[in-house]
C-alpha cells in the first residue's frame, strides 16, 4: 500500500460521499408550486381549527388596507394589520447578493413566493377563524428602534363584545427573536376562552440542492423527546403531524441554507406541534392550550418568532436545541467543535480565510502521529516487496498458502498491511466534518479572504484555488515512491488529481482553501518523514 493508492482510496471516499449527498437530495424531492397570480396573505386554510367547541364563529373579514413597518438595527419587518401577521422580514446586516445594495429578504409575500409568519387566537371568543382574521388598529404605521433604545413594543388592538385584545410585537436590539404577546382583557359579563396558534406558511418548493452544495429547504422541529428532526414538504403532504410538546418545550420551523424561521411557545406547560398542507402551501407551527379568562380579568399568551441567520449562540439562547438547525449531519460531534474552534480563531485574526488556514495547520498537526505511522508503514511495505515477489514466484497460484505465508512475514517483520490506508480512512471523518462546518456557517457567507476571493462560501470565480489544489496533489504523487507497475493503475493514478480539480471547481472557496493548505502541509510532512526514514534505511529516493 503506497501514497498513490491512498490517494485513490481518498478519491473513492470523496466521490462516494458526494454521491450519497446527491442521493439524499434526489430521493427526498419537494414538488415545486405553480403560482400564476399574486398570493394573498390570508385565505381559507390559514387558521387551524380549535380544539374547543364552537370555535369557528365568523369574524370581521375586511381586507387589510394598512401595513406597519418596524425597523431595528438588524431587522426591518412588515406587519399586516389584518391578523397581525409578519409578512416580510429583511435582514439589515446581510446583503441579498455579494456587493448588492439590496438586503436579504427572508419572509416575504409576493407574486413569486409566499413565506410568512402567522399567529392568532381561536376558540369561542377567538378573533381568528377560517372565515376571517382580526382587523387590528395601530397608533402609527412606522416604528423605529431608536439609538440607545434596547426594546421596542408595538401594540395592535381590537375591541369586540366587551373584550379588548392587544397583540404586542416586541423587538430588541441586536436580536432576531420577536416576542408576540396576546393580552386578553375580559370586561364582558361571561368567561372568555381562547387558544393561541403560531404558524409558518410557505409555498411547497423544490429543495434546490446540488452535488457540491446539497442544501435543505423545508420544515424542522424539536421537542423534549426529539432534539432535532427535519420534516420536508413531501412529509407534510404524506402525513399531518400532531405532536405533544411536553412541558411546552420545543420549536417548529422552516429552514433554508444559512437562514431559519421558527416559532417557540412560551410560559405553557403543554403545547402541540402541528403540520399540514392546504393548496400550494405547507404549514408548520405550534398550538397553545386553551385558556379561560373569567369576567373582569385578563391573561397573556406568548410565543417567540426567530427569523434570521443561523447564528448558533443566539439561537441556543432563544430556544433549547434551536441551534441544531445548523445541521452538521451524523458527524456533528466533530463538526461542532471544529466550528467553535474556527470561530475562536477568527475572533483573534479577524479573517475567515486566515482562520481556515490556521485551523488546517492545527488539525494536520494533531493528526501528524497518524501521518507518520502511515508513511512508516508504507516504507516497511516497500522494503518487503522483493521478498513478496520471491514468495509469489515460489508459491505460484496457491492463494491460501500465499496468504498464510504473507501473514507470517508481516508478523515476523512487525508490519501492519493496513497501516498505510487506515490513517487515510480515519482522516475522512475530519474532512467531511470540516465540509459541513464550512457549508453550514452563515459567518462565511460573503466573507472575503484576500484578492479575488471575495466570498469564501462561493466557488473561486477564476478557479485559481482548485488549480493550485490539483497541482499540489500532483506534486504529492510525484514525491511519493510507488510500487504500482500495472499501466492501467498508473493511468488511473495520474487522472486522480485531474478528477479532484474538476470536482473542486464548484466547491466553496473556503473548503478548497482548506484542502490546498492541507496538501501543502502534507508536502512538508512528507519531506520531513522521508528524510527521517532515509536515515533508518527505510526509504530511498
Swiss-Prot record:
CDD domains: 5TM_YidC_Alb3, EcYidC-like_peri. One of its GO terms (biological process) is protein transport. InterPro entries: Membr_insert_YidC, Membr_insert_YidC_N, YidC/ALB3/OXA1/COX18, YidC/Oxa/ALB_C, YidC_ALB_C, YidC_periplasmic_sf. It comes from the Bacteria. Keywords: Cell inner membrane, Cell membrane, Chaperone, Membrane, Protein transport, Transmembrane, Transmembrane helix, Transport. It is found in: Cell inner membrane. Its main location: membrane. It is a multi-pass membrane protein. Coiled coil: none annotated. Residues 34-55 have a biased composition (Polar residues). GO terms for cellular component: plasma membrane. The chain crosses the membrane at residues 7-27, 343-363, 418-438, 456-476, 495-515. GO terms for molecular function: membrane insertase activity. It holds the Pfam family 60KD_IMP. Residues 34-59 are annotated as: Disordered. Interacts with the Sec translocase complex via SecD. Specifically interacts with transmembrane segments of nascent integral membrane proteins during membrane integration. Required for the insertion and/or proper folding and/or complex formation of integral membrane proteins into the membrane. Involved in integration of membrane proteins that insert both dependently and independently of the Sec translocase complex, as well as at least some lipoproteins. Aids folding of multispanning membrane proteins. NCBIfam families: PRK01318.1-1 (NF002351), PRK01318.1-3 (NF002352), yidC_nterm (TIGR03593), yidC_oxa1_cterm (TIGR03592). This is Membrane protein insertase YidC. It comes from Aliivibrio salmonicida (strain LFI1238) (Vibrio salmonicida (strain LFI1238)).
Amino acid at each position: 500500500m503506497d501514497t498513490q493508492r491512498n490517494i485513490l482510496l481518498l478519491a473513492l471516499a470523496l466521490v462516494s460521499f458526494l454521491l450519497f449527498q446527491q442521493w439524499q437530495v434526489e430521493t427526498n424531492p419537494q414538488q415545486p408550486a405553480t403560482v400564476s397570480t399574486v398570493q394573498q396573505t390570508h385565505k381559507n386554510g390559514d387558521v387551524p381549527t380549535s380544539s374547543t367547541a364552537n370555535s369557528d364563529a365568523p369574524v370581521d373579514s375586511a381586507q387589510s388596507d394598512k401595513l406597519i413597518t418596524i425597523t431595528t438595527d438588524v431587522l426591518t419587518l412588515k406587519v399586516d394589520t389584518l391578523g397581525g401577521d409578519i409578512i416580510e422580514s429583511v435582514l439589515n446586516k446581510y446583503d441579498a447578493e455579494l456587493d448588492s445594495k439590496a438586503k436579504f429578504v427572508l419572509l416575504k409575500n409576493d407574486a413569486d413566493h409566499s413565506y410568512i409568519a402567522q399567529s392568532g387566537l381561536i376558540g369561542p371568543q377567538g378573533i381568528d377563524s377560517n372565515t376571517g382574521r382580526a382587523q387590528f388598529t395601530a397608533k402609527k404605521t412606522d416604528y423605529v428602534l431608536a439609538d440607545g433604545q434596547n426594546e421596542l413594543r408595538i401594540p395592535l388592538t381590537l375591541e369586540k363584545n366587551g373584550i379588548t385584545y392587544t397583540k404586542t410585537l416586541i423587538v430588541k436590539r441586536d436580536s432576531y427573536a420577536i416576542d408576540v404577546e396576546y393580552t386578553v382583557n375580559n370586561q364582558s359579563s361571561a368567561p372568555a376562552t381562547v387558544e393561541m396558534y403560531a404558524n409558518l406558511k410557505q409555498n411547497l418548493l423544490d429543495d434546490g440542492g446540488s452535488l457540491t452544495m446539497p442544501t435543505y429547504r423545508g420544515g424542522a422541529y424539536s421537542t423534549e423527546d426529539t432534539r432535532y428532526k427535519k420534516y420536508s414538504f413531501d412529509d407534510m403532504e404524506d402525513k399531518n403531524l400532531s405532536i405533544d410538546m411536553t412541558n411546552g418545550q420545543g420549536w417548529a420551523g422552516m429552514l433554508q441554507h444559512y437562514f431559519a424561521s421558527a416559532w417557540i411557545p412560551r410560559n405553557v406547560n403543554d403545547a402541540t406541534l402541528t403540520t399540514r398542507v392546504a393548496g400550494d402551501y405547507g404549514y408548520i407551527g405550534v398550538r397553545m392550550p386553551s385558556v379561560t379568562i373569567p369576567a373582569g380579568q385578563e391573561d397573556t399568551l406568548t410565543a417567540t418568532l426567530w427569523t434570521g441567520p443561523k447564528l448558533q449562540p443566539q439561537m441556543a439562547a432563544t430556544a433549547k436545541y434551536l441551534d441544531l438547525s445548523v445541521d452538521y449531519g451524523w458527524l456533528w460531534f466533530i463538526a461542532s467543535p471544529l466550528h467553535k474552534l474556527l470561530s475562536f480563531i477568527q475572533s483573534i485574526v479577524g479573517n475567515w480565510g486566515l482562520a481556515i488556514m490556521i485551523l488546517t495547520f492545527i488539525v494536520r498537526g494533531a493528526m501528524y502521529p497518524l501521518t507518520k505511522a502511515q508513511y512508516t508503514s508504507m516504507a516497511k511495505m516497500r522494503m518487503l516487496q522483493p521478498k513478496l515477489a520471491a514468495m509469489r514466484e515460489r508459491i505460484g497460484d496457491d492463494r491460501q498458502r500465499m496468504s498464510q505465508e504473507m501473514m507470517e512475514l508481516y508478523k515476523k517483520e512487525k508490519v501492519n498491511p493496513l497501516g498505510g490506508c487506515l490513517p487515510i480512512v480515519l482522516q475522512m471523518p475530519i474532512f467531511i466534518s470540516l465540509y459541513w462546518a464550512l457549508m453550514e456557517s452563515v459567518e462565511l457567507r460573503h466573507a472575503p479572504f484576500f484578492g479575488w476571493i471575495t466570498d469564501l462560501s462561493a466557488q473561486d470565480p477564476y478557479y485559481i484555488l482548485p488549480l493550485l489544489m490539483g497541482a499540489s496533489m500532483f506534486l504529492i504523487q510525484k514525491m511519493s515512491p510507488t510500487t504500482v507497475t500495472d499501466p492501467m493503475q498508473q493511468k488511473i493514478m495520474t487522472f486522480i488529481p485531474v478528477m479532484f480539480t474538476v470536482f473542486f471547481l464548484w466547491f466553496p472557496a473556503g473548503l478548497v482553501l482548506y484542502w490546498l493548505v492541507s496538501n501543502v502541509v502534507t508536502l512538508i510532512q512528507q519531506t520531513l518523514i522521508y528524510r527521517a526514514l532515509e536515515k533508518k534505511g527505510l526509504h530511498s529516493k
